[in-house]
């Protein structure tokens, strides 16, 4: 009898069964739109230029993907690919952060520069990549862009910069801030020879980048809904003690207030730039 009681109260053993409703998705296979939360196949999204199929939101696009989508196949020649940043101020853990971003993005800095053709029209180009230190502008970013502009000036080519940046890189202090002036001087020399500079702002374009070469194009373009501005929204509201419009610092707001020439959908990027380059070439003739 007592044996029977102990048998009944014997602790039951359970087997953990995997919850089959939790679908495992290998990393890199799927992507979620940050605006509407729609989940899409990464490959299909890339084929659509990282534009959401559902809400048309323009997601971040890395530098090489943008170059591949824009430049004629096989024409892009990269400049200064392996110029690498140093730690001039001995900022703590800066080298480790650089190495981490390098491993994650497979690029050496936050900008890719070079030249090639867009529908047959030769042009110099710099494309910032926000995955690397949030696209911040340090000494190497400034140096690479400056060298590319100088090359375009020497070769008598127009120049295009795609900006995507959180501003100057704080780990490099005043050395990063001086890149604002250095790039602007190179652009001014480029302009003095009668050459065209197109600034193409993408999300986000803020801080020192927005206050220098991002906003001084002969033609200023931007992608839809891009955040463009110098100081943050909250800082401005606290300073002026007023609530700002909901669309403040968006590409559309800047267009309405005369600070942009056109807001360009990513799928129209190549067509619009081709038209501008074509008109510029005719003007030279």
Curated annotation (Swiss-Prot):
GO terms for biological process: fatty acid biosynthetic process; malonyl-CoA biosynthetic process. Binds 1 zinc ion per subunit. Residues 29-285 form the CoA carboxyltransferase N-terminal domain. A zinc finger (C4-type) spans 33-55. Keywords: ATP-binding, Cytoplasm, Fatty acid biosynthesis, Fatty acid metabolism, Lipid biosynthesis, Lipid metabolism, Metal-binding, Nucleotide-binding, Transferase, Zinc, Zinc-finger. Its cofactor is Zn(2+). Pathway: Lipid metabolism; malonyl-CoA biosynthesis; malonyl-CoA from acetyl-CoA: step 1/1. It holds the Pfam family Zn_ribbon_ACC. InterPro entries: AcCoA_carboxyl_beta (IPR034733), Acetyl_CoA_COase_Trfase_b_su (IPR000438), ClpP/crotonase-like_dom_sf (IPR029045), COA_CT_N (IPR011762), Znf-ACC (IPR041010). Its EC number is 2.1.3.15. GO terms for molecular function: acetyl-CoA carboxylase activity; ATP binding; carboxyl- or carbamoyltransferase activity; zinc ion binding. Zn(2+) binds at residues 33, 36, 52, 55. One of its GO terms (cellular component) is acetyl-CoA carboxylase complex. Gene3D superfamilies: 2-enoyl-CoA Hydratase, Chain A, domain 1. It comes from the Bacteria. It is found in: Cytoplasm. It catalyses: N(6)-carboxybiotinyl-L-lysyl-[protein] + acetyl-CoA = N(6)-biotinyl-L-lysyl-[protein] + malonyl-CoA. PANTHER family: ACETYL-COENZYME A CARBOXYLASE CARBOXYL TRANSFERASE SUBUNIT BETA, CHLOROPLASTIC. Acetyl-CoA carboxylase is a heterohexamer composed of biotin carboxyl carrier protein (AccB), biotin carboxylase (AccC) and two subunits each of ACCase subunit alpha (AccA) and ACCase subunit beta (AccD). NCBIfam families: accD. Component of the acetyl coenzyme A carboxylase (ACC) complex. Biotin carboxylase (BC) catalyzes the carboxylation of biotin on its carrier protein (BCCP) and then the CO(2) group is transferred by the transcarboxylase to acetyl-CoA to form malonyl-CoA. Belongs to the AccD/PCCB family. This is Acetyl-coenzyme A carboxylase carboxyl transferase subunit beta. It comes from Macrococcus caseolyticus (strain JCSC5402). The lineage of its organism: Bacteria, Bacillati, Bacillota, Bacilli, Bacillales.
């Amino acid at each position: 009898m007592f044996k029977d009681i102990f048998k009944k109260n014997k602790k039951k053993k359970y087997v953990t069964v995997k919850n089959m409703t939790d679908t495992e998705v290998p990393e890199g296979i799927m992507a979620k739109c940050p605006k509407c939360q729609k989940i899409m196949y990464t490959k299909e999204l890339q084929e659509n230029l990282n534009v959401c199929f559902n809400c048309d939101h323009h997601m971040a696009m890395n530098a090489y993907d943008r170059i591949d989508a824009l430049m004629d196949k096989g024409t892009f020649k990269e400049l200064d690919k392996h110029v690498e940043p140093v730690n001039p101020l001995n900022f703590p853990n800066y080298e480790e952060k650089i190495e981490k971003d390098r491993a994650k993005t497979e690029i050496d800095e936050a900008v890719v520069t070079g030249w090639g053709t867009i529908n047959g029209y030769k042009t110099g180009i710099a494309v910032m990549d926000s995955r690397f230190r949030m696209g911040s502008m340090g000494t190497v970013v400034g140096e690479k862009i400056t060298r590319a502009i100088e090359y375009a000036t020497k070769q008598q080519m127009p120049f295009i910069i795609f900006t995507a940046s959180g501003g100057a890189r704080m780990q490099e202090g005043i050395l990063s801030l001086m890149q604002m002036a250095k790039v602007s001087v190179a652009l001014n020399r480029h302009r003095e020879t009668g050459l065209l500079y197109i600034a193409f702002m993408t999300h986000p374009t803020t801080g020192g980048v927005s206050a220098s070469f991002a906003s001084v194009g002969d033609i200023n373009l931007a992608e839809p809904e891009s955040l463009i501005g110098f100081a943050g929204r909250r800082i401005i509201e606290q300073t002026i003690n007023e609530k700002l419009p909901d669309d403040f610092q968006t590409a559309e707001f800047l267009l309405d207030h005369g600070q942009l020439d056109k807001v360009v959908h990513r799928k129209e990027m190549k067509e619009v730039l081709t038209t501008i380059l074509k008109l510029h070439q005719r003007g030279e003739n």
